[in-house]
């Protein structure tokens, strides 16, 4: 029998609406979603109320011409409207395309055209830009506010030319359930890798069910626990690591508009938060000696096992590694597992792991650094595909193994140690940035002969992009060229992708076959002010 068909059979009859319905029947009055906007107490939804609003939205979307398989852009900062619309698309059988709100118009044009999105849901802050970037959309629906903040007069005027989000709600009594199809796509997130354009990662309902099963086990999340979600909801951390983990056990999600150091602990205390994802910029708040003692926080979902931080923060940091393509945690480790300090834990059951020498294609021995490869069923443990990108799909997989681009080594007791990421992929404050995408923009300037973009260490964001440039002429006005490069990048790239500096050099350090040694460029960048 076909192993992939057997894997899919295990998900028979299960999808996102099945999951929502289960908890609405089992725990109708238990809080599912709590909105925690800035300086205010927001509304909350029980599981019964959440299912009702999701059905109402699904009915309304269908009435607006959205059919199963259609793709709907959701371009918004964290807000309950975004979560409800995301779940409603899944319930209807449509595909929610959640996009980064730092994206500029050119990027939104690409997202809309590449996914062939038919409609969009957004906020007043973005509707003007989105309408210009994607004029082919059938309609755009706009929320009344920007994640709890009132719109400006210009934003209000722009919003009035489009549908109101609240007008999308229909009559839940008219909802007609569809047959469950676990392998049906439900969501698309864009991720930057080593290619020049972000790739559209397709997740299925089976991916969601997998995340809802595995996520809670990996982080000891129980039905009476509460997970604080502050990472952007257009990222896999918020969607799969957090929200689907909550839905897997009927727990509670508390949603913040975005990271706020001043609101972090008050929200945790007020809502008895037990679990939180730990991003680099949250470390200072967790280690604040004046943090309140009367809190229930006990688990931080982090990348590595670091007992010293456990003691400093007064919570347990669970090691979890994954990416958009792995849906949830592909490795995991708990302080009680007895694994070495600094490891990412062990491979999560359901995935297979290999550490491969990139030059020879052979397995590395324990202690040797190689590329991390993962194997699982596509559409269950791993993403289904990169949408409409056969070249990227072919390049990403080899004999069923997904090549992550991350360099690791195996240690004692199956522990995995992170070494470095692919030289052409940067991680800026949690956002993936393709060096090649930035290089493509910088390299179009007439004064640039060659360009190499690398990461420079940053205290707050971990790393930021910088560009090393070889000029096409010897007497170039470096200040003027730098200014023009920055302007071009700001026009065409999201703010986190824009180089923080341009360094002019006479030559790049190179190795065999004249390959640019980006590691040396990173060291050169860190040595500069």
Model-derived regions: residue spans:
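Conserved pre-ATP/AMP-binding loop-to-beta segment of ANL
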Residues: 28-31, 141-142, 159-163, 169-190, ...
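Conserved AMP-binding/adenylate-forming core of the ANL superfamily
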Residues: 29-79, 83-87, 104-109, 205-206
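Conserved AMP-binding A3 loop
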Residues: 44-48, 186-210
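A short helix-loop-beta submotif of the ANL/AMP-binding
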Residues: 58, 71, 77-97, 101-105, ...
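Structural core segment of the AMP-binding/adenylate-forming
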Residues: 59, 63-64, 91-164, 272, ...
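Conserved AMP-binding/adenylation subdomain of ANL enzymes
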Residues: 93, 209-226, 234-275, 348
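AMP-binding/adenylate-forming catalytic core of the ANL superfamily
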Residues: 101-110, 120-122, 276, 353, ...
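Gly/Ser/Thr-rich phosphate-binding loop
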Residues: 270-341, 352, 363
């Amino acid at each position: 029998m076909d192993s992939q068909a057997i894997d899919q059979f295990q998900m028979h009859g299960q999808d996102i609406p099945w999951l929502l319905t289960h908890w609405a029947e089992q725990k109708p009055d238990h809080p599912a979603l709590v909105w925690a906007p800035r300086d205010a107490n927001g509304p909350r939804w029980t599981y019964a109320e959440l299912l009702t609003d999701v059905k109402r939205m699904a009915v309304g979307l269908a009435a607006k011409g959205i059919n199963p398989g259609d793709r709907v852009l959701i371009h918004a900062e964290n807000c309950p409207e975004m979560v409800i619309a995301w779940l409603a698309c899944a319930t209807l059988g449509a595909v929610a395309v959640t996009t980064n709100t730092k994206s500029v118009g050119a990027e939104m044009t690409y997202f809309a055209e590449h996914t062939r999105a038919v409609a969009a849901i957004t906020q007043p802050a973005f509707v003007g830009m989105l309408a210009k970037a994607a004029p082919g959309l059938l309609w755009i629906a706009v929320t009344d506010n920007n994640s709890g903040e009132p719109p400006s007069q210009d934003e209000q005027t722009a919003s009035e030319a489009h549908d109101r989000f609240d007008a999308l709600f229909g009559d839940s009594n008219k909802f007609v359930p569809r047959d469950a199809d676990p392998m049906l796509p439900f969501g698309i997130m864009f991720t930057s890798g080593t290619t020049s354009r972000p790739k559209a990662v397709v997740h299925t309902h089976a991916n969601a069910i997998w995340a809802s099963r595995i996520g809670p086990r990996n982080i000891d999340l129980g039905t009476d626990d509460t997970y604080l979600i502050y990472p952007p909801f257009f990222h896999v951390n918020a969607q799969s690591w957090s929200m689907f983990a909550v839905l897997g056990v009927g727990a509670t999600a508390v949603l913040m508009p975005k990271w706020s150091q001043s609101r972090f602990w008050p929200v945790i205390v007020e809502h008895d938060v037990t679990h939180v994802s730990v991003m680099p910029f949250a470390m200072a708040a967790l280690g604040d000696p004046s943090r309140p003692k009367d809190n229930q926080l006990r688990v931080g979902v982090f990348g590595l096992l670091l007992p010293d931080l456990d003691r400093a923060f007064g919570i347990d940091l669970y090691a979890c590694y994954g990416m958009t393509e792995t849906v949830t945690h592909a490795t995991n480790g708990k302080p009680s597992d007895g694994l070495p300090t600094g490891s990412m834990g062990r491979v999560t059951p359901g995935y297979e792991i290999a550490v491969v020498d990139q030059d020879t294609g052979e397995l590395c021995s324990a202690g040797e650094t190689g590329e991390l490869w993962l194997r699982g069923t596509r559409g269950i443990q791993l993403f289904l595909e990169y949408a409409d990108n056969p070249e990227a799909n072919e390049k990403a997989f080899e004999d069923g193994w997904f090549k992550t681009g991350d360099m690791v080594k195996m240690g004692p007791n199956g522990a995995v140690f992170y070494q470095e990421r692919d030289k052409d992929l940067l991680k800026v404050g949690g956002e993936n940035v393709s060096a090649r995408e930035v290089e493509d923009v910088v390299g179009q300037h007439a004064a640039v002969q060659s360009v190499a973009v690398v990461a420079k260490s940053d205290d707050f964001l971990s790393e930021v992009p910088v560009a090393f440039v070889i000029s096409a002429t010897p007497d170039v006005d470096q200040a003027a060229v730098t200014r023009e490069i920055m302007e071009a990048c700001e026009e065409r790239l999201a703010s986190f992708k824009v180089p923080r500096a341009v360094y002019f050099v006479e030559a790049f350090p190179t190795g065999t076959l004249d390959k640019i040694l980006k590691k040396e460029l990173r060291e050169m960048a860190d040595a500069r002010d």
